[in-house]
Design a protein with these regions (language model features):
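Local beta-strand N-terminus motif with an aromatic residue
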Residues: 17, 35-36
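Conserved Rossmann-like nucleotide-binding pocket used by diverse enzymes
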Residues: 20, 39, 68
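Short conserved AdoMet
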Residues: 13, 48, 62, 120, ...
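Conserved hydrophobic residues forming the short capping helix/wall of the S-adenosyl-L-methionine
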Residues: 9-12, 88, 119, 174
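A short SAM/SAH-binding and catalytic strip from SAM-dependent methyltransferases
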Residues: 36-51, 73
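Class I SAM-dependent methyltransferase SAM/SAH-binding core
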Residues: 1-29, 52
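Conserved Class I S-adenosyl-L-methionine
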Residues: 104-204
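Conserved catalytic/acceptor-binding region of the Class I
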Residues: 51, 58, 64-137
Length: 204
């Protein structure tokens, strides 16, 4: 928003950084084929319409450019992830019963199969690689409870009191699973890397 943009410009006024305000669906402030690398950190799953985002990304990439993104992975591949998810959502849905009925973004982005097909439709002359990985976070139960909650948008709709109660339950879960005072939270992720092949005309 305007206030965030103003603050960013003020804080980096003496640097070479340049800030532009826009949406991922429309970045006309940038010229065609003007970026070597475009990185999207966990935002692609929230974007709708996502096809316009991908079209814009393709327009901005140079011939051998790279588009990389971190996207939610398969929850069944990460031990303990669903347990943490269920603790958080139990608290949220006790206050907001309909929360989670509708997911944000395009559902095709939420599975590796749907994502592969979606990317192939836009990035015709690119190599597309989707790699499932898990990220492990290790800390004392109290610290890990707060860190893990921060990865779930649902936790931010709770009041301070309800949020604190949720953290208490998360801490209890991590205490029960700790080893030598340290617990682990595992998050499933799909790593998307799209590379331009170059060396010829692209299909548009």
């Amino acid at each position: 928003n305007d206030s965030e943009l103003k603050l960013a410009r003020e804080r980096l006024a003496h640097s070479d950084a340049k800030f532009h305000q826009g949406t991922a669906q429309n970045l006309d402030c940038f010229a065609d084929s003007s970026f070597d690398v475009i990185f999207c950190h966990w935002a692609l799953t929230l974007m709708d319409p996502v096809v316009e985002v991908l079209d814009t990304t393709k327009r901005l990439l140079k011939e051998r450019g790279i588009f990389a993104a971190i996207i939610d992975g398969d929850s069944k591949t990460a031990p303990g992830y669903l347990e943490v998810h269920d603790i958080i959502y139990e608290h949220v849905q006790s206050k907001y019963p309909d929360y989670g009925v509708f997911e944000l973004g395009d559902p095709r982005v939420r599975t590796a199969e749907g994502l592969q097909k979606l990317m192939a439709e836009t990035f015709v002359d690119f190599d597309i690689d989707i790699t499932p990985i898990t990220l492990n976070f290790n800390a004392a139960p109290k610290i890990l409870a707060r860190e893990a909650a921060g990865f779930f948008y649902a936790s931010f709709v709770l009041s301070p009191t309800d949020f604190s109660q949720m953290l208490t339950d998360l801490e209890k879960y991590f205490i029960a699973t700790q080893q030598d005072g340290i617990s682990c939270f595992t998050m499933p992720v799909n790593r998307l890397v799209v590379r331009g092949r170059g060396g010829g005309n692209r299909t548009v």
